[in-house]
């Protein structure tokens, strides 16, 4: 459940491709054109603070990611720049429609003069054809809220920090052990599959929002599973204790029934 936003309203706006105003800025849904970058950076949204080293886990989201990356850069040089903080900044650039080439001029990091590892604020200048120039000073606490907004606009859910960390790790270990093979996951094949199903050219997908793309992809997947399970059960080749595991081609099961 969203802590700061009306989830259904944010999703409605995101599906329309329109921006959501927040903190004096305009946040846009990320499009399929940038899906590869989004997938490479989404771990910055879904990271569990409770699974970070204790020194970072006790900090707020923005400060934890920022100080963690500063420490990594001090230890590993340029290699340390590829952390959660950099990924979050890339997602911010995409969401604000800032030109990556001018991002360093449009997003300024303000740190404590006595402790450069302490983030004080982001000073952001955003210019769009629709809304002109916007200026905002964003606090670390607001960055945590922006994290939630970007996740909602692009169909992602934030982790529940109250979940049992040891149980989560155990489940991840089991999934790793049970992985029989690795798929060659790539955007070209995924886009080709969706385009073929929708009878459109692949390049037309680039302007879709990620949220719409994923909803269509999941609908295709649900429909195929509904048919395969239904045919299998009708033929007598397989019998499901509680009926078709995917009982509808149009709707998902309620979560408590999954």
Listing of model-derived features with the role each one plays in the protein:
Residues 2, 10, 89, 93, ...:
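Intrinsically disordered, low-complexity regions
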Residues 7, 97, 108, 113, ...:
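Context-gated lysine
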Residues 24, 117, 131-133, 182, ...:
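Intrinsic-disorder/low-complexity loop/linker signature
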Residues 87-173:
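Long amphipathic alpha-helical segments with strong coiled-coil/leucine-zipper propensity
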Residues 233-258:
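Long, intrinsically disordered, low-complexity Ser/Thr/Pro-rich regulatory/activation regions
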């Amino acid at each position: 459940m969203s802590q700061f936003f009306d989830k259904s309203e944010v999703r409605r706006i995101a599906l329309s491709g329109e921006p959501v105003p927040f903190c004096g800025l305009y946040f846009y849904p990320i499009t399929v054109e940038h899906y590869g970058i989004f997938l490479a950076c989404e771990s910055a949204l879904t990271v569990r603070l409770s699974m970070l080293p204790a020194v970072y886990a006790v900090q707020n989201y923005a400060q934890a990611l920022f100080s963690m990356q500063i420490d990594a850069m001090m230890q590993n040089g340029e290699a340390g720049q590829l952390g959660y903080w950099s990924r979050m900044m890339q997602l911010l650039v995409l969401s604000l429609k800032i030109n990556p080439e001018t991002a360093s001029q449009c997003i300024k990091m303000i740190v404590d003069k006595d402790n450069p590892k302490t983030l004080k604020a982001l000073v952001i200048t955003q210019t769009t054809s629709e809304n002109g120039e916007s200026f905002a000073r964003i606090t670390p606490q607001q960055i945590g809220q922006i994290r939630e907004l970007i996740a909602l606009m692009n169909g992602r859910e934030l982790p529940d920090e109250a979940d049992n960390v040891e149980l989560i790790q155990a489940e991840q270990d089991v999934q790793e052990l049970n992985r029989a093979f690795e798929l060659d996951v790539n955007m070209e094949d995924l886009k080709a599959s969706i385009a073929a199903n929708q009878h459109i050219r692949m390049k037309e997908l680039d302007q879709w929002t990620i949220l719409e793309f994923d909803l269509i992809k999941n609908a295709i997947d649900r429909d195929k599973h509904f048919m395969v399970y239904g045919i299998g059960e009708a033929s007598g080749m397989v019998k499901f204790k509680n009926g078709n595991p995917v009982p509808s081609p149009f709707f998902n099961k309620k979560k408590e029934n999954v």
